[in-house]
């Protein structure tokens, strides 16, 4: 079963500490998963679930998987915004987290690159990639380095390309192969 929930363009998949109506983390990791498990014949445990996304959804997939390793056994990100701090004026982030100068703690606590400490060994299978011409490239490379420093196994790929549907049309093939192998075990 593949489920593609709407990320509302700028939800960033967390529960906003500023806008209490933005409860995407709760919706996705709790309400949606429970609804799918109650409606369909699923493997209702982490070994039967994976999450992935692109761009904001790549941030969201890793954010949710890092924070809720009891829900997902594998996670992927394509061109993910894995460090949102360099972009305080973009994509409604200040509406979700508050002004960076005032609410720096919100930004530090809700960016994927600062959540690597939550990972333990190879308990969560990870795949991510980014095009070398993508504005998120540097952040993905830094995440890769942090994972290496902590000896967290992961698949990471850099390829030609930017932040585009052409790039993701190619990237998704590798993600699907990775998840197919994950579910085969």
Regions found by a protein language model. Name each.
Residues 1-185:
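Non-catalytic cap/lid and distal C-terminal segments of serine-dependent acyl enzymes
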């Amino acid at each position: 079963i593949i489920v593609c929930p709407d990320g509302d363009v700028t939800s960033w998949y967390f529960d906003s500490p500023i806008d209490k109506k933005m409860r995407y983390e709760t919706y996705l990791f709790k309400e949606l998963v429970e609804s799918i498990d109650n409606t369909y014949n699923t493997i209702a445990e982490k070994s039967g679930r994976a999450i992935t996304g692109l761009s904001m959804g790549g941030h969201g997939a890793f954010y949710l998987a890092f924070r809720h390793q009891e829900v997902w056994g594998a996670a992927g990100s394509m061109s993910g915004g894995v460090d949102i701090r360099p972009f305080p004026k973009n994509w409604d982030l200040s509406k979700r987290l508050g002004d960076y100068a005032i609410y720096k703690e919100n930004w530090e606590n809700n960016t994927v690159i600062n959540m690597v400490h939550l990972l333990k060994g190879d308990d969560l299978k990870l795949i991510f990639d980014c095009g070398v011409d993508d504005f998120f490239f540097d952040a993905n490379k830094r995440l890769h380095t942090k994972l290496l420093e902590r000896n967290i196994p992961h698949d990471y790929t850099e390829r030609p390309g930017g932040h585009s549907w052409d790039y993701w049309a190619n990237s998704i093939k590798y993600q699907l192969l990775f998840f197919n192998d994950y579910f085969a075990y």
